Design a protein with these regions (language model features):
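Residue(s) in the substrate-gating loop at a strand-loop-helix junction
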Residues: 134
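Conserved mid-core segment of classical short-chain dehydrogenase/reductases
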Residues: 83-100, 143-146, 186
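Alpha-helical segment proximal to the catalytic Tyr-Lys
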Residues: 119, 162-164
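N-terminal Rossmann NAD(P)H-binding glycine-rich loop of SDR-like oxidoreductase domains
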Residues: 17, 25
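Rossmann-fold scaffold of SDR-type NAD(P)-dependent oxidoreductases
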Residues: 14, 75-83, 106, 131, ...
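C-terminal helical subdomain
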Residues: 167-170, 174-175, 182, 191-225
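Catalytic Tyr-X3-Lys loop
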Residues: 92-111, 130, 154
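Active-site helix of classical SDR
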Residues: 114, 150
Length: 225
């Protein structure tokens, strides 16, 4: 894909403060996009990327998202890398607060982003919405229920939203990571083979592909990485 394939296009990256979101925002900026990075708070100065404008919003707050989309330039693409994680625990130890938190962080956030993104993209006549699911939503073994079911919900959301926009110039897809090579994951799993883990820059290329103008026939896809 040409390095300037997003020149003149506005892209919103939700979760831009996280390891994945930071890398995805950087990839779009490098490809020529005008990027708005959204986080719950402003990133530290040394994490701010040149060419990325940073704003704050609570992605589980419908009103804050409405205000954000009203304030930013009409986007070509909306990228959602927001997410929380909860480890495996047996059902006998299911924590209702953890379940609620995971549904809020992963599914409610994705649903509200979809609501406002599709309104903006359909109003513009074309565009791309790309979510982030997880292999845990497909393969439940070894996954925490709260996390797994919330990511399964994201996969179903993408399928339903894609059906809704089918036949238009708007598409809805998702990237489905397994493990990602991040400092936090390395710290959590110090004895794993980190060299075999997918790297953020490589995963970011999947978002570029799904958000590209040339990917107009790709709708409802879940790309495993």
């Amino acid at each position: 894909m040409p390095n300037d394939s997003f020149t003149g296009r506005d892209v919103i990256v939700f979760g831009a403060n996280g390891a994945l979101g930071h890398g995805v925002a950087e990839a779009f900026a490098d490809a020529g996009a005008s990027v708005t990075g959204v986080g719950r708070s402003q990133p530290h100065a040394d994490r701010k990327l040149p060419g990325v404008s940073y704003v704050t919003a609570d992605v589980t707050d419908d009103g804050e998202l409405a205000a954000l989309f009203a304030d930013v330039a009409a986007p070509w693409a909306v990228i959602n890398t927001v997410g929380g994680f909860a480890p495996y625990r047996p059902f006998a130890r299911l924590d209702p607060a953890e379940l609620t938190s995971q549904l809020n962080d992963n599914l409610i956030s994705a649903a509200l982003i979809t609501k406002h993104a599709l309104a903006a993209l359909t109003s513009a006549g074309a565009g791309r919405l790309v979510h982030t699911a997880s292999r845990a939503g497909v393969v439940s073994k070894g996954s925490g229920f709260a996390y797994s079911v919330s990511k399964l919900g994201v996969l179903h959301l993408v399928s339903m939203a894609a059906d809704e926009v089918r036949g238009t110039r708007v598409t809805v897809n998702c990237v489905v990571p397994s493990i990602i090579d991040t400092p936090a994951n390395r710290a959590a799993l110090p004895n794993s083979d980190h060299g075999s883990w997918p790297k953020v820059p490589d995963i970011a290329r999947s978002y570029l592909y799904l958000a590209a103008p040339e990917s107009d026939l790709v709708n409802g896809a879940a790309i495993p990485v």
